[in-house]
Amino acid sequence: MKKIYLKKLTAFGFTGILSFYLAGSVGAFECKVKQSSMAKPSGFPSRALTMIVPYGPAGGSGQIAAAMAEAVTGHTGVSINRDHKPGGSGTVGMTAYMSAPADGYTVLEHIDDASSAHALDSSRPNPSVDLIPLVISQVTFSQIYIRTNETRYNDWKSYAKWVKAQNGKSTIANVSKEGSMERVTMKFITEAAGLKIQQISFDKGAPRYGALLGGQVDALFEQPGDVRKFLDAGKFKPILTIFNERPSVFASVPTHRDMGMSFEPLLRFRGFYVHANAPANRVEWLQWAFQRAYCQNSYQKFNESKFMTVIDSYRDTAGARILINNSIAQYRDVYKAMGLDVK
C-alpha cells in the first residue's frame, strides 16, 4: 500500500468537514422536533418494527440501537425488535437490510462505515440515496487505550517508545475492515509517529475489549462512549485523543496534535435509516418518531453518559445527507492517496 503523505490531507478539505461535525450548539439541549405526537398513516405501524444492527450488541452500535429503540417505544408505544447481524464491518447487515421488504417495518442502524464502503466501491449502497437517513444521533472522536494496571508504559510517550523497541511485534485491537475510519486513522498515526503496530481484528465490541482486558493485545483503538464502563471501573485509560483539541472530560489526555501529528481527525457517526423505496407517508412518520426520540430524556441521558455531548450529535434527514455526502467525498480522496482501487 502506498505511503500517505499527511501534508496532502489539508487539501482534502477535512477542516471543512470537521466544521460541519462541530456545527450547532453543544450547550443547553433544545429539542428541534416540536411536534410531540403524530397520527399513524393508515394505521402504520400496526405491529412491531425490526431494527437490523450490523454489529454485535456489546459495541457502540449495539448500545445506541438499544437506547434509540427504548426512546422510540417510550414516546410512540411501538415496539422495536433488534436483529444483530455482525460481520464484514457492517456489510453483512447492510446486505441483509437491502434484501428486506421496503415497507417501512424494517429500519437499519449503521455508522460511517456505510459511507466509506460506498466511497471505495460505488456499487455498494449509498446511505444518502439508496437509504433515507431518519436521524444521525451520535458524532464522536476516537482514542487509544491501555490497561490502567499496565507496567510497560503509562502514557503516549512511553507507549510509543516501547512500541518502537518491539520491532513490529506490538499489537492493538481494532476493527477488521481496511479503509474504515479506524484503520485509516491508525495508518495516519503510525506514519506520523514512525510506529509499526500489528492491528488485531475484531468486528464485535466484546471480544475487542476483552482482548485488551485479558492482555492479548497491548492497546485498543475505540471511541470513549463505547468503553465507558471500563473507564468508570478503572480498567482502561486513554493515552491519546484523536481530535483537534482536548475535550474537557479528557483534559489530561494529549491529542494527536499535541504529539506532533498534523492530520485532521476522522470522526465516528451513527444513525438510523429506512429503505429509499419505503412508502413516503411511512417514512415521514418514522422520521418524526426517530428524531423526536432523540429528544427523550432516556436517550439524552444515554448520550451524555457516552460523552456524546462534546460534539453536536444531532442531524435530521437533510443534515445527515450533507454529512454523508461530505464524508463520501473525503474518504474517496483519502483512498486515492492510499493507492486503493476506488471504483
What are these regions (language model features)?
Residues 129-137, 196-200, 218, 228-266:
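Short beta-strand->loop
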